[in-house]
Curated annotation (Swiss-Prot):
<dbReference type="InterPro" id="IPR037124">
    <property type="entry name" value="Chaperonin_GroES_sf"/>
</dbReference>
<dbReference type="GO" id="GO:0046872">
    <property type="term" value="F:metal ion binding"/>
</dbReference>
<dbReference type="GO" id="GO:0051082">
    <property type="term" value="F:unfolded protein binding"/>
</dbReference>
<dbReference type="GO" id="GO:0005737">
    <property type="term" value="C:cytoplasm"/>
</dbReference>
<dbReference type="GO" id="GO:0051085">
    <property type="term" value="P:chaperone cofactor-dependent protein refolding"/>
</dbReference>
<keyword id="KW-0963">Cytoplasm</keyword>
<dbReference type="InterPro" id="IPR011032">
    <property type="entry name" value="GroES-like_sf"/>
</dbReference>
<dbReference type="InterPro" id="IPR018369">
    <property type="entry name" value="Chaprnonin_Cpn10_CS"/>
</dbReference>
<keyword id="KW-0143">Chaperone</keyword>
<dbReference type="GO" id="GO:0051087">
    <property type="term" value="F:protein-folding chaperone binding"/>
</dbReference>
<comment type="function">
    <text>Together with the chaperonin GroEL, plays an essential role in assisting protein folding. The GroEL-GroES system forms a nano-cage that allows encapsulation of the non-native substrate proteins and provides a physical environment optimized to promote and accelerate protein folding. GroES binds to the apical surface of the GroEL ring, thereby capping the opening of the GroEL channel.</text>
</comment>
<comment type="subunit">
    <text>Heptamer of 7 subunits arranged in a ring. Interacts with the chaperonin GroEL.</text>
</comment>
<comment type="similarity">
    <text>Belongs to the GroES chaperonin family.</text>
</comment>
<dbReference type="GO" id="GO:0005524">
    <property type="term" value="F:ATP binding"/>
</dbReference>
<dbReference type="Pfam" id="PF00166">
    <property type="entry name" value="Cpn10"/>
</dbReference>
<protein>
    <recommendedName>
        <fullName>Co-chaperonin GroES</fullName>
    </recommendedName>
</protein>
<dbReference type="GO" id="GO:0044183">
    <property type="term" value="F:protein folding chaperone"/>
</dbReference>
Length: 118
């Protein structure tokens, strides 16, 4: 099923957490903490055509009590506001799209982090 987030939102599939500890103890599903990282599966048009800070396939970190859970075709997803994303894992900069050529940090901040203007 296709899902297109609206506003400044992204659709995220949580990354699976390990089922056992480093010492080999198996953790039952009901005792596991839900992971705070996931893979972006879809972004709203406002993000994809605006700041482009997050794109499909990015691994992101997000706040523990953020977003709304939905189920699509039997798979659990999170719908998160752009402002609830803490960062992109494994990326040196949110300008990883390669479309930016900033010489000063203030230009970078204005372009990539002032989402309300885009």
């Amino acid at each position: 099923m296709k899902f297109q987030p609206l506003g400044e939102r992204v659709l995220v599939e949580r990354l699976e957490e390990e089922n056992k500890t480093s010492s080999g103890i198996i953790i039952p599903d009901n005792a596991k903490e839900k992971p705070l990282m996931g893979v972006v599966k879809a972004v709203s048009h406002k993000i994809s055509e605006g700041c482009k800070c997050v794109k499909e396939g990015d691994v992101i970190a997000f706040g523990k009590y953020k977003g709304a859970e939905i189920v699509l075709d039997g798979v659990e997803y999170m719908v998160l506001e752009l402002e609830d994303i803490l960062g992109i894992v494994g990326s040196g900069s949110c300008c990883h799209t390669g479309n930016h050529d900033h010489k000063h940090a203030k230009e970078h901040e204005a372009c990539c982090h002032d989402h309300k203007k885009h």
